[in-house]
Amino acid sequence: MKTSTALVLLLALTATSASSGDHQFIDEQNIMNVAEGKNVISSLSSSGGGDDAAAIMESVLVNGGNRKMVFMMVSGSQANCIPTGQPCGVLHQCCDGNFCTDPFYGTCTVKHCVPKGQPCGVLHPCCEGMCPDPIYGTCR
């Protein structure tokens, strides 16, 4: 969960166009703190603290960030998820636990699992346990 959150937050960072290097540094620092599970206290917030996502959203919006990206950061990927058979990617995640065949130009596919003794990898997860190798593993 933290990895996907960090990825979305880092993509939000690249989508921003800050007017000052200081603001960009604040965004990077906030994003890294959230990725590490730390509480973010935004200097922009009038309340002096609070929800991590709200602090980052406010910071990104003040610095000219992408509103769609901020919405995804706050609402999660299921708010505007992509149904099975439709184009997907990092910014357009699949619904109901299905997976995307490619991070940029993929298609939402029904999630399936591989039984013990069969080849597994990132796109072919094991039904029981973890795949020992992300590309050329065998389910144990």
Curated annotation (Swiss-Prot):
Signal peptide from the UniProt entry: 1-18
The organism's place on the tree of life at top rank: Eukaryota
UniProt KW Plastid keyword: no
Membrane-spanning parts: none
Domain-level remarks: The presence of 'disulfide through disulfide knots' structurally defines this protein as a knottin. This toxin contains 2 'disulfide through disulfide knots'.
Family to which this protein belongs: Belongs to the urticatoxin-2 family.
Entry protein name: Beta/delta-urticatoxin-De2a
Taxonomic placement: Eukaryota, Viridiplantae, Streptophyta, Embryophyta, Tracheophyta
